Every structure is written in C-alpha cells, then in structure tokens.
Amino acid sequence: KELYLITYHPLTLNVKNTQKEIKTLLKKLDTLKNASLIFTKANADENGLLINEILQDYCQKNSHKAKLFDNLGSQKYLSLMKIAKAMIGNSSSGISESPFFKTPCINIGDRQKGRLRTQNIIDCEINDLDQAFEKLESKEFK
C-alpha cells in the first residue's frame, strides 16, 4: 500500500466552502487505489472542528484504509512523512519539512502563500487535484 499523510486546515471562514473543500479532497482520495490514508486533525477553530467531524466520519466508514489522529507527535509524524508517497493538504509542515525527506507535497490553496518553495511542492487549488495527482505520478516529477 502507498501511504499518504494528510493535514488540511480550513481555507475560509465560510462553512459551506469548508465542507465543499474537504469533501472534494476526500472524493479525490477515494480514487486512489491501494492507498493508506493517515489524517491529522485540523486546527481547533470553528471550521477546523467541522473538518474534523467530516474526517472522523470518513475514517469510520473507511477504517480499512483511513485513520485520523489528534496529534502524532513530532517523531511519528516525521517518520510517516519520510515513508509517505506524498504529503497532502495545506499545512506549513508540507512546505517546511517534506523537502528534507524529498517527499512530494501537494499543497492546496493559498494558506502557505509567501513561503519559499522547493521542487517537491506541487501547488494547486482544491478543484485542480486531478492535475496535481497527475503531476505527482509523472516521470518528470519522480
């Protein structure tokens, strides 16, 4: 199985947009064959709690391939990042830590705007996930 490490925080204060964003991400993750999905919870603001509820429900329904963690701690988190096929989401750790392991990172949205990028980062909008995963699988990217 291929491991994906996913951390997704709310991009907007709009509840409907937040729901749509996380459901779009989960729909894309459902298309991945032979995947193990490790989610870490979103931050604890209002829409972060909404994301966490949606993730909890998703992981319960897909317990054969998806697990949700409150907090993995640095050592476990970095160990998983090292062996992951990709990091997915909009967490600063995707930008700042994934390059050390040469782990590809699909960075969604503008949350990390202004941070320095390395070649392992694939920036995309939530509606461009198909193209981001195509790039992840491309020979040029590997």
Task: Give the location of each predicted region.
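Nucleotide-activated sugar donor-binding and catalytic core shared by glycosyltransferases
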Residues: 1-142
